[in-house]
């Protein structure tokens, strides 16, 4: 009965609370490289300030630079994008590395999550889009049951239609299925090199890199080599060599934790032992971590996530097509390859809210709660829920994402009206707002 009331509330929202149709403004660009606000840039800001002689700006421009930056850090990100047009000096401040870092540090105290909806109604790649919506984690973490209102951010020209396709956030920049990187706040995106499989971020050097494979032509699917692109600095693709034996990657979403990309694989030995492949983004070194056989399973029966800075695997147990429980494996010691495990039960009431739709585990929030949500919008118009599972207390709470797929107008606007095609859902957890300009930071050469 509660779900029906929620649906009724969604449909009765005033027009002011509904999402607007798609304001498509897709911009090509390029992504982030490391730099700091050096003295030369300080001089540039002062020069820009001298050039702006409009009397209406003099009062603001006479403020000390530190005070100007302190004021600007309190302004919403998308409003800052408009303020770039006020003067050259304001634009220089907003685009400076020092200000970008300060803004990110403040934004990191209030993380958000991004929901990506990908329509599969068109076969032509150029017509496939992923729509990105942002939500605040803060309200949901303070109550046992609540609803959140979405903000439409932007659309990017790629699809999330595959089971292994993922949406991930790296230091304020989103990676959409190894094809596109974008910043929702600047509404810029850039296409990743062809052949990219995974994207990782090194927090020490503030560097993004893409990883791809060379596959054995005689036995497709066996990785026998690796190629890397540095997303920034103008470097082209390069081969990296390691002493790893050939292996076959498992089609699972990867996870990047503290500058290391983790993904599943099977060795090509007679026993086909499951392993976790580790790629250190900074050193570009590869290594194996052995894992229990059940930790890595294809077909989304298991999934790797970041749990409080540790690699974890969730292995689902099904009963009658519904997940009844899951086993939670945590890599406690990467050097000794030691794992811990615990069993977690699902309350059957969850299925009252998601219907007959496959669910997935999309990482955790800052509190360490596992985020669970449907992988598709229901083909019937109904409210969309996500769930937070606390592994320590074995409790779960639900949060309704208002407006997402809950009325026909939304579905028509965002390409999910066709009941014959799935609208795919992916979630990037713990996203932090950044105002980094892609064209200032990622310079791709393939």
Swiss-Prot record:
Top-level taxon: Eukaryota
Name this polypeptide is given: Putative F-box protein At1g32660
CDD domains with a match to the protein in the record: F-box_AtFBW1-like (cd22157)
Record PROSITE patterns: FBOX
Transmembrane portions of the chain: none
InterPro entries with a match to the protein in the record: F-box-assoc_dom_typ3, F-box-assoc_interact_dom, F-box-like_dom_sf, F-box_dom
Location of region: Disordered: 1-57
Organism of provenance: Arabidopsis thaliana
Residue stretches making up the F-box domain: 57-107
Basic and acidic residues: compositionally biased ranges: 1-12, 43-57
Pfam families found in the cross-reference section: F-box (PF00646), FBA_3 (PF08268)
């Amino acid at each position: 009965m509660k779900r029906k009331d929620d649906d009724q509330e969604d449909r009765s929202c005033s027009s002011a609370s509904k999402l607007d149709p798609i304001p498509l403004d897709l911009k090509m660009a390029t992504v982030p490289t490391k730099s700091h606000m050096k003295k030369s840039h300080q001089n540039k800001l002062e020069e820009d300030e001298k050039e702006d002689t409009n009397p209406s700006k003099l009062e603001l421009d006479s403020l000390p630079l530190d005070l100007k930056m302190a004021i600007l850090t309190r302004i919403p990100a998308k409003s800052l994008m408009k303020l770039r047009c006020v003067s050259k000096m304001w634009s220089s401040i907003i685009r400076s590395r020092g200000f970008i870092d300060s803004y990110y540090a403040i934004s990191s105290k209030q993380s958000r999550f991004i929901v990506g909806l990908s329509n599969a109604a068109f076969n032509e790649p150029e017509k496939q889009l992923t729509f990105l919506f942002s939500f605040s984690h803060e309200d949901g973490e303070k109550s046992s049951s609540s609803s959140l209102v979405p903000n439409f951010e932007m659309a990017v020209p790629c699809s999330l239609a595959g089971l292994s396709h993922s949406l991930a956030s790296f230091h304020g920049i989103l990676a959409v299925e190894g094809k596109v990187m974008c910043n929702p706040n600047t509404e810029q995106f850039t296409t990743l090199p062809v052949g990219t499989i995974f994207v990782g971020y090194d927090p020490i050097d503030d560097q993004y890199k893409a990883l791809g494979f060379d596959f054995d032509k005689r036995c497709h699917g066996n990785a026998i080599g690796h190629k890397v692109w540095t997303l920034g600095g103008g470097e082209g693709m390069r081969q990296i060599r390691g002493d790893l034996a050939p292996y076959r990657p498992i089609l699972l979403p990867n996870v990047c934790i503290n500058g290391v990309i983790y993904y599943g694989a099977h060795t090509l030995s007679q026993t086909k032992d499951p392993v976790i492949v580790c790629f250190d983004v900074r050193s570009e070194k590869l290594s194996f971590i052995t894992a229990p056989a059940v930790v890595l399973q294809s077909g989304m029966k298991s999934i790797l996530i970041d749990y409080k800075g540790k690699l974890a695997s969730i292995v689902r147990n099904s009963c009658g097509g519904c997940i009844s429980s899951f086993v939670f494996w945590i890599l406690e010691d990467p050097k000794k390859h030691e794992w811990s495990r615990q069993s977690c039960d699902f309350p059957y009431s969850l299925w009252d809210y998601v219907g007959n739709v496959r669910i997935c585990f999309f990482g955790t929030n800052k509190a360490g709660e596992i985020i669970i949500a449907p992988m598709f919008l229901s083909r019937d118009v109904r409210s969309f829920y996500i769930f937070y599972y606390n592994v320590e207390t074995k409790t779960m709470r639900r949060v309704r994402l208002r407006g997402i797929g809950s009325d026909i107008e939304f579905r028509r606007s965002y390409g999910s009206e066709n009941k014959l095609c799935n609208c795919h859902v992916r979630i990037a957890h713990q996203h932090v707002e950044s105002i980094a300009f892609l064209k200032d930071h990622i310079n791709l050469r393939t």
